[in-house]
Amino acid sequence: MKFGLKDESLRVRHFVTELTGGTGVASLGLHKALVRRGVESRLHYRFGSSNASQVTLDQRHCSRFWRLWGRYVISRRWRQQNPERGIFIHSRWIYPSRLHNFGPTPDVVNLHLVFRWLDLSSFLSSIPEGLPVVWSLHDLHPVTGGCIHPIDCQHFTVHCHDCPNLKRPRKRDCSWHEFNLKDRLYRGLNLHIVGNSEWTTAQARRSALMRHARSFQTIPPGLDTEQFTCVEKSCARQALGVASKKFVVGFCCPDLSDPNKGALMLLESLRALAAEIEMTLLVVGSGKLPAVDGKFEVIKLGTIHSPRLQSVFYSACDVFAVPSRIESFGLTALEAMACGTPVVAFRTGGLTELLVHEETGLLADLAAGAPSLFETLSWMIHHPSERQNMGRAARLRVEREFGASLLAQRYAELYQSLTASTHLGDGRS
């Protein structure tokens, strides 16, 4: 019988490009939960800041030359993309990175979103043979030739080419070369895939690149429910300068202009709703929101990183909207639920697993677009009692199924199973 390492003996290194955005928040939350559990976890990152223990900023190549060179490469690659479709991400970066650059070899390497920091070619090639590599999928970039979400493109299931995310797609375009590179790098890795939803895991299994994966798991993100908590609505609104009697819809995403996040459909729905009730759109995020014609109030709060301030934002809302065309999970929806706010979203991706329709929120029909979103929001307006019950049920669901301790337990059990054979002969138990 094989036994893995005990929690306190596990040495795990996490890698994530930045600590902001859904991926950064989820990665840092996992690391903190593992540390509380006793796992020797260390997280490495390139952008952002944190005062959490065992979190290390990569300070290599921080000179002005490397910053300017990085910006130039990003802008050049950006010009190759089709902005209406979504971003295209390259696996190579401007300088090499190797596992030994970050300290002693751990028992497990856990990758998150690492583009524009870790050069995959040099980094994956530096990992010792047999060392378990867990790749936590926050999107589908690791399993495609460059896109974050294939949407209706099926090329990743065979071999990427003619990529719709590129301005000039062709048979042997960037996606074809990227797919070849990943196929070569994944071959021979002790690779284990963890999807943040069953939907994400199912999509990963469909990728031709994932024939190299040794196992597939689904572990949804978790939250510290003592930090993300319900705030008295009247107090939250007073703190944010929101009128107490208005119907408040919340919306949050890192880039408000990202077409995938659905701001245009949300605004179209709210214009129609403004004829029914006095309302406010409360917005968190950076970037430019599409023009609003003044039929309803818009309050932009900018970017908020503090969970306690985020709790104030979510608690001030009557309903939180996630009008994305696709979401692998929907971390902002989870955060809103933890604060007792019901969620309205499209029936797409991992959102269908997170939200329980008519219990913790409502799911609109993506194919119907803005009219369906309008109907669900209108129902929320005219059913205040049911809406409040949904908010309470949402909080209970997060406490029961998405707590940080449960997240750490699931990952620790995975690490233990992967290290069972690795350390059989080294005297550790």
What residue ranges belong to the model's regions?
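Nucleotide-activated donor-binding/catalytic signature segment of Leloir-type glycosyltransferases, i.e.
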Residues: 285-308
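A short, well-ordered alpha-helix in the C-terminal region of glycosyltransferases
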Residues: 379, 386-401, 407-413
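Aromatic "clamp/platform" in nucleotide-sugar-dependent glycosyltransferases that forms part
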Residues: 325
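Conserved donor-binding/catalytic core segment of Leloir-type glycosyltransferases
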Residues: 243-261, 267-270
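A short, active-site helix/loop in glycosyltransferases that binds the activated sugar's phosphate group
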Residues: 144-148, 169-216, 223-233
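Short alpha-helical donor nucleotide-sugar binding micro-motif in glycosyltransferases
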Residues: 312-317
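Short hydrophobic beta-strand element within catalytic cores of glycosyltransferases
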Residues: 342-345, 355
